[in-house]
């Protein structure tokens, strides 16, 4: 590989001498606060005489500055608008199973509760990434996991259930052959919640403080009418064929008109108080309350100045409405102000309100409100009131289905069997019968899928969203056609220091690669500490492994002067001698007062710190000028464990004095070890036969330590309290929570507000505060390279001109028409099989994930409400406004053309529709 010239190297290191934004953010990436999502308050409403009428506890989100007290501006002010747990990613049975050959199994667990298992071998988003998608249906809900496909390794039903922590059975799983089972399983999936929504809209005049007064408003103001027009379109109810949200579309008994819109594939009907029937004789307006009072989410549009008495949820007599969105319009600056009230039991949901929660761009306000309300209704369905009802319904449906299938258990089912492909091999004598059964199975599934789409009940697709929207996790091409195997890496300024099979390389976007060490030095772990001028690395393996410490400035000088490339034998002076035989090390990653290093040598932990040096570099002390910084470190103590740790993380105590901790993972447990005393305490025990430890990530909520414990498919948050009498207070907390990944990750990265899981072929992105899924990117042959500051990963892509563009060029020319790196990956992988595949390096800037502050305009998850469409002449453009979903119209057109074919052979375009969805 050609080395750069001295001039190029000098130019490169101008960037190395400047600390990157990501380096500054990296030390506080684990800081977060739930206060950004509001605080719980006791809200009381009283009558005109001051007597208390109703009271309730609600979480109040107002985006006020007091929610951010004590936080450095820019530390966390995210306002990216994401639908949480989007149906496109969560409704697996509709997306991956219907219309395709798959297996369904029935069984009972050790407690005699029936369960169903569905398995399909599918191509992940048509990216030539075969995976087993598995769904376990139980009364407590569905569990979904992806398992890798191997053409040489068979996968049994038992092993799939074992991966789902279901290992003991009263009756082993047997396969269901009847195609009608697809209808029943689709009904089970629909219990997760409707894909369409109905929201109440209540108009309140200035000074109105009771629900009777608000519901009695016959008409709204001009500003209220403009707000309704912003929300959606006015539609005539009589004869309406779309989603009706419980309104009468035949006899006008619920009004003549309503407001309707489609947002990212979701149909939304608004129950507007002034459009519902009004009765002069009935002061309570029962008909209006019947609809709006039974909506989970209600928007309250309140007239008047901000100093006037404000709306409180306790003013509304409803036991069903859990979320209120208070909207005020300011005529002076043509802006909207938003405030959210959520019943205390509703889990946290985003997006958090900006500070201040004032929107001058009306389209962005519409996007924010709709996403907030959709996420809020989904979160409400997880409250005990709704989840217990859903569990009873699921239990009833599953038991009823089990009883219906019992007579056929021995006649039409097989015992448990192993399979390694979607289509199991059949004996020649029964192959024709099996093929006929599969054809009928697929035909029924495709017909069911189309029917669901025509009704408007299909999970949303990405067809109505903007593919060109810039997301915080959007990657940039960093290095094209990288031929080496990567062992580990870390950021150094704007460059990347990489340990490869060819040695240690310094890679910079748009620059020629520089070799720093030759291939005799094999580094397995590394940390580049720019602020301390250190490079820490673990080399080799087994008995010869050591911890090395280099001075960054010395390494930089060697490269600039083009001296001889260092080898393993030039690093003798950089060894920390007592670290021989180490297999793992960890450093404190956050802003504590001193650098701490813990080295694991089998089951022994060695604690190392940096010596306190009162002399600075300007004094000319021999210690500061020494080329090797080994003498600047001191050994504090040794701690013995019962087993060698697999995962190790340092946790900063609240005072930093005798209360720092080490989290270690081994066997089936995570333990906390006191750095000062060496005592260990059980933090979490894992009830599973096989444990795959992934990570233990230290995070700090409002300055208090917590840990994200990642193993198997699980990520669990545990809060760690200050030490009391020498031991940490480890106890269940209301803030502890856990969630499951869809695929077992090999690495997890926290960049608040996001947590990213890296698997062999995908990046799964969730929110830290609630574990909700926001995006899944399919990235074949994915390898995480570095993540301490900016995130770098290696992935397969076909050789093309677009893959050679630099991240700097991409950043400068990025526009709504510019495809993201993910788009380039997906496009290239869908090209012909004959193209030569290569590995490229991609970069996700940490500043995009955690570093943006609240500024106008807010990010919008959709294309603008009005877009321009070029005509054939290329000159004139037409405005296109939001309207009833085109996808529904297209589905109806397909249905009309294929109604006859549904009774016979499958048409070609039928399969096109199925694959599109």
From Swiss-Prot:
Gene Ontology molecular function terms on file: GTPase activator activity
Source species of the chain: Gallus gallus (Chicken)
Alphabetically ordered keywords of this record: GTPase activation
Gene3D superfamilies reported in the protein's UniProt record: Rap/Ran-GAP
Family classification: Belongs to the GARNL3 family.
Pfam families cross-referenced by the UniProt entry: CNH, Rap_GAP
Family annotation (SUPFAM superfamilies): Rap/Ran-GAP
Keyword Mitochondrion: no
Gene Ontology BP, a term: regulation of small GTPase mediated signal transduction
Protein name: GTPase-activating Rap/Ran-GAP domain-like protein 3
Rap-GAP domain segment(s): 185-401
Keyword Cell membrane: no
Domain (CNH) ranges: 483-792
């Amino acid at each position: 590989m050609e080395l750069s010239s001295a001039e190029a190297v000098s130019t490169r290191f101008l960037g190395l001498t400047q600390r990157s934004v990501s380096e500054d953010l990296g030390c506080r990436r684990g800081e977060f606060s739930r206060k950004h999502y509001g605080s719980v308050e006791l809200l009381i409403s009283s009558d005109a005489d001051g007597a208390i009428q109703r009271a309730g506890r609600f979480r109040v989100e107002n985006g006020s500055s007091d929610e951010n007290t004590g936080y450095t501006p820019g530390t966390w002010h995210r306002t990216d608008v994401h639908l949480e747990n989007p149906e496109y990613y969560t409704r697996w049975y509709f997306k991956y199973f219907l219309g395709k050959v798959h297996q369904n199994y029935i069984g009972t667990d050790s407690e005699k509760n029936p369960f169903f298992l569905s398995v399909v071998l599918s191509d992940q988003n048509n990216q030539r990434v075969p995976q087993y998608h598995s769904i376990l249906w139980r009364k407590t809900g569905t569990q979904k996991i992806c398992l890798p496909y191997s053409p040489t390794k068979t996968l049994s039903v038992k092993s799939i259930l074992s991966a789902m922590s279901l290992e003991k059975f009263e009756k082993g799983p047997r396969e269901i052959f009847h195609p009608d089972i697809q209808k029943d399983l689709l009904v089970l999936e629909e219990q997760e919640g409707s894909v369409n929504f109905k929201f109440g809209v209540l108009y309140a005049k200035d000074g109105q403080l009771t629900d009777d007064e608000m519901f009695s408003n016959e008409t709204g103001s001009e500003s209220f009418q403009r707000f309704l027009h912003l929300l959606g379109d006015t539609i005539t109810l009589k004869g309406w064929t779309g989603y009706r949200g419980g309104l009468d579309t035949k006899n006008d008994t619920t009004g003549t008109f309503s407001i309707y819109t489609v947002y990212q594939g979701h149909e939304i009907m608004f129950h507007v108080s002034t459009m519902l029937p009004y009765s002069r004789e009935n002061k309570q307006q029962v008909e209006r309350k019947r609809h709006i009072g039974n909506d989970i989410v209600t928007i309250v549009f309140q007239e008047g100045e901000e100093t006037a008495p404000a709306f409180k949820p306790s003013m509304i007599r409803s036991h069903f409405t859990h979320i209120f969105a208070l909207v005020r319009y300011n005529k002076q600056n043509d802006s909207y102000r938003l405030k959210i009230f959520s019943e205390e039991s509703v889990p946290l949901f985003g997006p958090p309100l900006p500070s201040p929660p004032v929107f001058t761009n009306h389209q962005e306000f519409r996007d924010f409100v709709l996403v907030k309300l959709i996420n809020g209704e989904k979160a409400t369905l997880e409250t005990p009131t709704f989840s217990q009802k859903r569990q009873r319904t699921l239990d009833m449906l599953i038991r009823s289905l089990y009883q219906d299938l019992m007579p056929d258990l021995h006649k039409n089912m097989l015992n448990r069997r192993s399979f390694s492909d979607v289509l199991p091999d059949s004996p020649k004598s029964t192959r024709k019968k099996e093929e006929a059964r599969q054809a009928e199975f697929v035909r029924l599934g495709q017909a069911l899928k189309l029917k669901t789409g025509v009704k408007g009940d299909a999970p949303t697709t990405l067809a109505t969203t903007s593919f060109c929207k810039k997301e915080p996790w959007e990657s940039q091409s960093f290095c094209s056609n990288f031929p080496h195997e990567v062992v580990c890496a870390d950021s150094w300024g704007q460059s990347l220091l990489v340990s490869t099979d060819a040695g240690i390389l310094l890679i910079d976007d748009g620059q020629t690669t520089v070799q720093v060490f030759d291939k005799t030095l094999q580094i397995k772990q590394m940390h580049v500490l720019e602020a301390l001028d250190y490079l820490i690395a673990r080399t080799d393996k087994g008995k010869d492994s050591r911890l090395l410490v280099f001075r960054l400035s010395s390494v930089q000088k060697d490269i600039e002067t083009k001296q001889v490339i260092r080898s393993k034998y030039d690093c003798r002076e950089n060894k920390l001698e007592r670290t021989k035989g180490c297999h793992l090390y960890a450093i404190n990653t956050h802003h504590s007062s001193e650098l701490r290093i813990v080295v694991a040598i089998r089951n022994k932990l060695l604690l190392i710190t940096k010596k306190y040096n009162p002399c600075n570099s300007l004094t000319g002390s021999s210690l500061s000028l020494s080329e090797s910084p080994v003498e600047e470190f001191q050994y504090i103590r040794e701690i013995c464990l019962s087993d060698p740790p697999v995962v190790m993380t340092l946790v900063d105590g609240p005072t930093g004095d005798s209360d720092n901790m080490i989290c270690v993972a081994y066997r089936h447990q995570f333990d906390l070890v006191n750095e000062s005393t060496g005592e260990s305490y059980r933090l979490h025990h894992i009830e599973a036969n096989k444990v795959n430890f992934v990570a233990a990530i230290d995070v700090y909520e409002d300055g208090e330590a917590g840990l994200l414990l990642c193993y198997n498919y699980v990520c669990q948050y545990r809060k760690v309290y200050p030490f009391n009498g020498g031991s940490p207070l480890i106890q269940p907390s209301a803030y502890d929570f856990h969630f499951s990944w869809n695929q077992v990750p090999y690495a997890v990265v926290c960049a608040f507000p996001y947590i990213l899981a890296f698997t062999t072929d995908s990046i799964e992105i969730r929110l830290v505060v609630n574990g909700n899924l926001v995006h899944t990117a399919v990235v074949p042959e994915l390898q995480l390279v570095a993540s301490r500051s900016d995130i770098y990963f290696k992935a397969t892509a076909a050789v093309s001109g677009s893959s050679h563009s630099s991240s700097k060029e991409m950043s400068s020319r990025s526009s709504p028409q510019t495809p993201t790196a993910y788009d380039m990956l997906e496009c290239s992988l869908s090209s012909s099989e004959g193209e030569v595949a290569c590995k490229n390096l991609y970069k996700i800037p940490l500043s995009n994930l955690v570093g943006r502050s609240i500024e106008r305009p807010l990010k919008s998850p959709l294309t603008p409400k009005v877009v321009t469409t070029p005509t054939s002449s290329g000159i004139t453009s037409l405005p296109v406004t939001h309207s009833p979903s085109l996808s529904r119209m297209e589905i109806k057109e397909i249905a009309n053309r294929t109604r006859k074919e549904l009774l016979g052979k499958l048409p070609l375009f039928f399969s096109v529709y199925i694959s599109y969805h």
